[in-house]
A protein has these predicted regions:
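Lipid interaction determinants
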Residues: 18-229, 240-258
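Sec-dependent N-terminal signal peptides
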Residues: 6-11
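Positively charged n-region of N-terminal signal peptides that target proteins for export
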Residues: 1-4
């Protein structure tokens, strides 16, 4: 009898030891970790940050900054510093971002004169984007959001738009393209009777003097992002050329962005 009881106890212990271990909320914990990993993958330099809302410490909209939502006003971050564009002048300065805190160094600015509304926009955003701010990155990589809380309690909310480097998956090469005054008929594989920009690369020496052309005019079978061609006007553009890592089937493998 004792042997039977002992054998049953051993079997029960073995079955318990071999059973899979689980804990309440195991599935939700995994989902939380996945979401957290997605958020931690977000980075300030990977996006242009467009102003979407601006409120003061009491939650009221800041009138002078509403112009920056319509314009829109945009932040960008790089190894060289932070840039603010969309007002009258470009403002720029150093920054550090760590553990949910954004520290902005004293901003410098270009010195254009504009209508009062844009000048006020520059002053208001510069007044808030200084010193230590509380920064919160949220959302997924496809729809990121940035919230900045200034020292006066103002809350600035931004939505992220991928930079070309993020969108195309390459660093990009800076080059100069000369664009001919007239478009020319070209054989586009997707668009009948298409007219291409005629371009050629231009180079400069260390003194900034333009060198003689090293190639003939040739058709560009795509647009240049950020460039609107004026018929009859020849121009030289400073562009970045990106290798598109995973382009759609009907898209070019290289992209030109001003």
């Amino acid at each position: 009898m004792k042997k039977t009881i002992l054998l049953a106890s051993v079997c029960a212990a073995l079955l318990q030891a071999c059973a899979p271990v689980s804990s309440p909320g195991e599935g939700s914990s995994t989902m939380s970790t996945t979401a957290s990993s997605s958020r931690s993958a977000l980075s300030l330099p990977a996006y242009y940050w467009r102003l979407a809302a601006a409120t003061d410490a009491s939650g009221k909209a800041i009138p002078a900054l509403q112009r920056g939502i319509e314009q829109p006003l945009r932040l960008s971050f790089s190894a060289d510093g932070m840039n603010i564009r969309g007002g009258c002048n470009t403002q720029f300065g150093g920054y550090t971002y760590k553990d949910g805190g954004l520290r902005v160094a004293t901003l410098a600015s270009t010195m254009k004169a504009c209508e009062p509304g844009l000048m006020k926009l520059d002053a208001e955003i510069g007044q808030r984007l200084k010193g230590d701010l509380r920064a919160t990155l949220s959302g997924e990589s496809t729809e990121p959001a940035l919230e900045l809380v200034a020292q006066d309690g103002s809350v600035l909310k931004f939505v992220g738009e991928p930079t070309p480097e993020t969108l195309y998956g390459s660093a990009g090469e800076t080059m100069f393209l000369e664009v001919a005054p007239k478009r020319a008929d070209c054989s586009h594989p997707m668009i009948p009777r298409y007219q291409c920009l005629m371009v050629r690369e231009r180079r400069y020496n260390d003194a900034g003097v333009q060198l003689p052309p090293q190639e003939d005019w040739h058709p560009l079978y795509q647009s240049i992002e950020g460039y609107d061609h004026r018929d009859g006007v020849r121009t030289v553009l400073r562009v970045k050329r990106y290798d598109w890592k995973n382009p759609p089937a009907d898209a070019p493998s290289k992209v030109y962005v001003m």
